[in-house]
Amino acid sequence: MATRIRTPSPEDFPARADLVVIGGGVVGAATAFYASRAGLDVLVLERRSALATLTTTRSLEAFRAQFEDATDIGMMRESIETFERFGEIVGLPGYDLSLHQPGYLFVTREPDGGAKVAARVAAQRAAGLHDVEHWTGHEARRRFPWLSPDVSAAAFRQRDGWLASHELTYGFARASGMLFFVETEATGFATAKGRLEGVVTSRGDVRAPRAVVAAGPYAGKVAALAGVSLPISPVRRHRAGIKAHELIPRDAPMTVSLETGAHFRPEGPGAWFGWSNAFEEPPREPTDDVPANPLFPALALDAVSQFAPFWGDVAQTLKSSNVTVEAGLYDLTPDARPIIGASGTVEGLFVNSGYSGHGVMGSAAGARRLADLIVGREREDTNPFRLARFDDPRAAAARKRPL
């Protein structure tokens, strides 16, 4: 069945669905796909005029399995394996995600960084990530001569990389065969005796025994309509772009400083930059139009030039017309892991949000897990991403997921 993405008219608004997904970004579209594969009739609601037009398009569109925790590694490996065989897995032979796998390179400039990277890689290999490599600074510069002379060690995995998030979103949507309503906002929930009975929208009501909040930085506000409190904080994050420059190595991997978190990757003849620590960013109310700080490109360029000095040369010859800067919102949780599973307050209401900047890379595995939870193929009490984990006092003190 062909996917139908449209603004609904009163006469074609469905009376009921097995599942309503609130949010038409990459996570919502992936949720629709896996739920449809589980046999559910799905309706997706997106209040904006098109899918994937908010946080999905403000990302660096990257993916990696190089985390430190086995749970995170397993999740991202599953997503990456899906991306690598996307057309085959979702039933769209030849579908192009613009998949690039030049790798992810984590570097350290600390004198004792070699031991820290070795421990990091050992933990990753113990978690099943056997193809991550540990390099000395010399080995890293032999592979990538543009690295700083004081880079003391590095970790590299070739199968990490990036893709086109717009194509990923629409691929999931198309493969789902489900109905997607744009310009349609969820404004409330119908419940009775603690159970979900339907979703109230700006264009009509739909009866449904199940719904998923996949609304990114708006997830907290949407869940609150049902009396559910989510520990999700919208926090501003920037990305800067350079349209083109002859000094940018086009074969560079995504390169990340283990000390600062500053990172860059090539994009055609140009590049993208990110750096979560450029500014102190308090939580804010979710909004579609997030103002960018014009100082970010200069700060990010300086940060990446510390481990890749050619960026200093780029900065010397760069024209302002060749630089872009945008801002969006991360949906941060206390432990920087997503909330995937039952709401715990309203039976039939589920959450797939809080990816904390990793929504593109985690979308496939997270949505697959949620679909399995909804239909009973997985148990909520053994789900590591369940909302109830924050009821444990130890969770409040847990440090955020490392790079």
Describe the function of each predicted region.
Residues 36-56:
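Glycine-rich FAD pyrophosphate-binding loop
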Residues 155-209:
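Helical element adjacent to the flavin cofactor pocket in flavoenzyme catalytic cores
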Residues 60-143, 261-263:
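Dinucleotide-binding Rossmann-like beta1-alpha1 core, especially the glycine-rich loop
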Residues 305-403:
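C-terminal catalytic lobe of FAD-dependent flavoproteins
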Residues 52, 205-253:
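Central helical "cap/lid" subdomain
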Residues 244-348:
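Active-site lid/adjacent beta-loop-alpha segment flanking the redox-cofactor pocket in flavoenzymes
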Residues 17-43:
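N-terminal Rossmann-like FAD-binding beta1-loop-alpha1 element of flavoenzymes
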Residues 1-19, 37-38, 400:
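Extreme N-terminal leader/targeting segments of oxidoreductases
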